[in-house]
Amino acid sequence: HKTIQFIVAALFIASACTDDRDNLMVNDQIGLLHSTYTETEIFRGMDTPYQLFVIKSGKGKQETEVSISVDETVLQSYNTDNGTSIQLLPSDCYTILQPALRLNDSDYRKAFDIKWNADRLSDLLSTGKEYGLPIQMSVVQNFISADDERLKTIIVPTIKEPYLQM
């Protein structure tokens, strides 16, 4: 009889406990790892795609889907704000391999893969002008808030010749 009373009392006390683990944690947010401006080197003869990472921060309890698109207004705003004259990279210089990603609740990062056309880029960049790929990320499913400061980037590629160093 006392054992039953003890078990009931223990269950009652345990149910009154609060979980304070999330008290100082912020809600999940999502954004690009490298926002605003990113330079990348493309080596001739190598077919490695560029990885544009999406980072999820916060409690880590929400899943979401995000997508990217090329947005020329991102480039125009950047040029105006920074006094630059980066030109829009023609669409035959790159391929966005997957324009949408799904992040599960346990994922904290995933990457969009962008494949470059190195030969076309080399011809284009030999003119001496600077070209960029302006990317705008959007949250497709609004289960998670977006970090407005980390939704846009301009990827500026440069062509390098591979070399061996000893």
Could you say what each language-model-derived stretch is?
Residues 1-9:
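Sec-dependent signal peptide recognition
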Residues 13-16:
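C-terminal motif of bacterial Sec signal peptides marking the signal peptidase cleavage site
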Residues 18-103, 107-111, 120-166:
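Acidic/polar, low-complexity intrinsically disordered N-terminal segments immediately downstream
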Residues 116-118:
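Localized edge beta-strand/strand-to-loop motifs within extracellular or lumenal beta-rich domains
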